[in-house]
């Protein structure tokens, strides 16, 4: 099980050697030492996760991966083609809308009138979704998840940008179509982790050209949550903490 953020925050208060202040050769030894036994390395995701990155996001994430490689992590290209199928199912409506609609109809019918307008079309479409289509989507996801699990036979994690775009400015008069178009862009690299029954951690690794945070996502096989946390913590020791990389939030500065 992934430990809560408070655990990680407390963990960083413990005294430890900083690999950013010692020779790179020693850094490599430390980096290897803090990883779990038999660490298989980091895979770099295929172009589906990178094409369309805005404002230098892709370059910043690749630079972070290069830093981990120089520190001793084994790195190689690792495609995850099942991500395309997962995102296709998501774009078709996924399975959550019909499951939510069924739950509301059964347990909280009065809540239907209070649903946010941007979510109304999805719930209305779910009302007419056939059982055959729902089961077909579940089958497609199950087969894709089974295939995706095998991609981790020779790597522990697959690295991608967390979000490919700079956070958009949201407006109050934004309609459902524009909202969902932006939403799809925001969750593009996140959907595969959920739909393929994987787990993931994200680390801030810099600021894009508009000064917004950029994340490095490390995706691991489902059930490898503890191992993923260990790897993410090791990567953070090399790359730096969020405060070291991003600085203090503007509203938190004295």
Predicted regions and their residues:
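Acyltransferase
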Residues: 55-79, 105-110, 134, 138-155, ...
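Short, surface-exposed loop/helix-turn segments at secondary-structure junctions
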Residues: 91, 135-136, 167-187
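Short helix-loop capping/hinge segments that flank enzyme active sites or metal/cofactor-binding pockets
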Residues: 39-41, 76, 94-146, 161, ...
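Short glycine-rich, flexible loops that bind phosphorylated cofactors or substrates
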Residues: 51, 166-167
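Small-aliphatic-rich amphipathic alpha-helix that forms the alpha element of a beta-alpha
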Residues: 149, 180-204
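Short connector loops at secondary-structure junctions
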Residues: 74-89, 123-124
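Short, Asp-centered acidic motifs that coordinate Mg2+ and/or phosphate
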Residues: 5, 156-158
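Structural helix-boundary/capping segments
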Residues: 1-51, 62-71, 135, 146, ...
């Amino acid at each position: 099980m992934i430990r809560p953020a408070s655990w990680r925050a407390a963990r960083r208060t413990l005294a430890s050697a900083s690999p950013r202040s010692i020779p790179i050769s020693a850094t490599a030894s430390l980096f290897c030492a803090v990883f779990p036994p038999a660490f298989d390395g980091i895979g770099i995701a295929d172009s589906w996760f990178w094409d369309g990155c805005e404002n230098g996001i892709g370059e910043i994430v690749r630079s972070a991966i290069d830093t981990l490689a120089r520190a001793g992590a084994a790195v190689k290209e690792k495609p995850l083609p099942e991500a395309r199928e997962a995102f296709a199912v998501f774009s078709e409506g996924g399975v959550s809308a019909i499951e939510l609609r069924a739950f509301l109809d059964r347990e909280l019918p009065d809540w239907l009138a209070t649903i946010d307008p941007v979510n109304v079309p999805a719930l209305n479409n779910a009302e007419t979704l056939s059982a055959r289509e729902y089961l077909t989507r579940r089958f497609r996801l199950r087969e894709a998840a089974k295939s995706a699990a095998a991609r981790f036979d020779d790597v522990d994690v697959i690295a991608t940008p967390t979000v490919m775009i700079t956070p958009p400015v949201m407006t109050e008069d934004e309609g459902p179509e524009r909202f969902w178009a932006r939403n799809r862009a925001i969750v593009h690299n996140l959907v595969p982790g959920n739909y393929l029954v994987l787990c993931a951690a994200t680390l801030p690794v810099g600021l894009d050209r508009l000064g917004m945070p950029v994340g490095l996502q490390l995706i691991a096989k489902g059930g490898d949550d503890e191992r993923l946390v260990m790897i993410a913590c090791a990567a953070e020791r090399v790359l730096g903490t969020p405060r070291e990389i991003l600085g203090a939030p503007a509203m938190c500065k004295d």
